[in-house]
Amino acid sequence: MDFFTEYGEGNRYKIEEVIGKGSYGVVCSALDTHTGEKVAIKKINDIFEHVSDATRILREIKLLRLLRHPDIVEIKHILLPPSRREFKDIYVVFELMESDLHQVIKANDDLTPEHYQFFLYQLLRGLKYIHTANVFHRDLKPKNILANADCKLKICDFGLARVAFSDTPTAIFWTDYVATRWYRAPELCGSFFSKYTPAIDIWSIGCIFAELLTGKPLFPGKNVVHQLDIITDLLGTPSTEAISRIRNEKARRYLSSMRRKKPIPFTQKFPNADPLALRLLERMLSFEPKDRPNAEEALADPYFRNIANVDREPSAQPVTKLEFEFERRRITKEDIRELIYRDILEYHPNMLREYLEGTESAGFMYPSAVDHFKKQFAYLEEHYAKGSTAAPPERQHNSLPRPSVLYSDDRPQNTANIAEDLSKCVLGDNTQKMHQGSASVCANRVPQGGAARPGKVVGSALRYGNCSTSTAEQYEHRRTDRNPALATNTVSPRGSYP
């Protein structure tokens, strides 16, 4: 295979500066010189040091390949490592997002009811797609929702997500469950083996929405007991029947012994909110999981009467067991390395063909762009530590594959807030309908070519309103067949992404 034919894009990405650094590695902003688009290249270091971390990375790579939707972050490409059996780092590339919802809430007190409605609609629409694929996110919180100045949100960080199959042992869901307590459903408080349903994600979305309305977390529990205490302060003491369904004995005893509390009316807790919004929020924050609406039911709520359109709220095909068979067995570092390598090949169709046909070389495969990225990342990291923003030396090599970087995490944010941009994000009158009767929020001011703000990176933004094509047309352009695990006699002509 002629590497320089398939990967002759060595000068396409101009690496600019470090925009994030943490235990996982480093994220650099870069310019796609072909399109003028800002991207972020994330280097994840030593991914096989711990099998649990490598498994989380594999899980996320797989899910972001399979769950392609405008409200979910999208991996476009992953650089092919130079050696199949010896690589330790991976480089993934996303378009640059300016911030996350945590920063938006923290920095912006000018959000309007239209913002609240549109934000919740996007989250529920993305969640419907996730849940109909039989996937449960398990870690929804403002830091895992990316935002840009077009008011576009994208769900990210699928490292704790799980795929639910009818015969999957319950324990598989909870082997590494460490989701943030503040957004954790009450049936999960203190229990790693509670009944597992999509309602846990609906609860999290309800907590996020309440935080949007008030500007502060709704249930900032200091521990499990305090978490249950402040939940019941708002919702009232649950019924005896509801308490009996909580599997954790200590939690059951605590709830049974607490003084009887009356629920606080949501109109009192959120005095300035739209009554329709509060009615939906109250349903989403039901103590009993069975009383919460699923994402599809929530989208049909009267609160969204002016923007909902079922044609733009697609369902996903369920994820196949074959994609996640590794969750059902004990795997070694070597197993994980091979599985991650196999998934990376989805972005390199020619190499995938050779791999499936058994003709691929097992050793050093080509003059890798990764080697050149290493030098530039090392240069930037050194200068980043000294506070310099100097750009790295230009590469003298033209073998860089196309992009793709990974999910966000909880590293401390040094994000320049997007309050100015977002406060100027003018929302269209929500009685004004878009194409085929669906209203859409529009940003009259879209940042053009400004410096990327440090912070979260990932996923492309779906433009709303002032666009050359309608939302539906943009979505249809993105809608391609999901890529199930390939049989040994099948090769995807373009990989799983355009």
Swiss-Prot record:
Q: Which GO terms describe its molecular function?
A: ATP binding; MAP kinase activity; protein serine kinase activity; protein serine/threonine kinase activity
* Domain Protein kinase residue range list: 13-304
Which reactions are catalysed by this chain? L-seryl-[protein] + ATP = O-phospho-L-seryl-[protein] + ADP + H(+); L-threonyl-[protein] + ATP = O-phospho-L-threonyl-[protein] + ADP + H(+)
Q: Name one GO biological process term.
A: intracellular signal transduction
Supply the EC number(s): 2.7.11.24
Q: What induces it?
A: By jasmonic acid (JA) and infection with rice blast fungus (M.grisea).
Q: Where is the active site?
A: D139 (proton acceptor)
Q: Give start-end positions of Polar residues composition bias.
A: 486-498
Q: Which UniProt keywords apply?
A: ATP-binding, Kinase, Nucleotide-binding, Phosphoprotein, Serine/threonine-protein kinase, Transferase
Name of the protein described by the UniProt record: Mitogen-activated protein kinase 15
